[in-house]
């Protein structure tokens, strides 16, 4: 038996079954004590952070999962050393990676930004809302796109999302260019005489991240 992934009740069941692990993690004899580790969990997704992820920590987690009669998803289970070049961690739509300082200083900072999968998903949603078969007026389409963009930006505003936001702005503008071309026999349809696509979209209130 089980529940569909993404089901309404799945997060509730995950919190019930994993609550004991949360508590035991911080009790005497748990990884918080013997490895100075930290546990970050959301529903059934969790990350354990420690300076050294030894076999004792891994074994403790496996025992807790077994005790809850759950099974680890081995496709999503891995041990990483984030300070190695190129190593990264994807969690809850974010990518975490230590990058070299852009000013040339001899240290690294923890770069947090939207993951590749999160960007692919928002691109697909923008394609849906600006598709040729999407029968909406330009103002209505912009209003719906704005709602999705605001929600996405509010979620990913933490860390360093500026590059991802800038790229998404360009992607959305290109999608609206195709949106307008599909509604005219001409290759483009300016909003006003001499008005650029960017200024026209801004006048209609398109959100810029």
Can you name each region flagged by the protein language model?
Residues 1-209:
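Non-catalytic terminal/accessory segments
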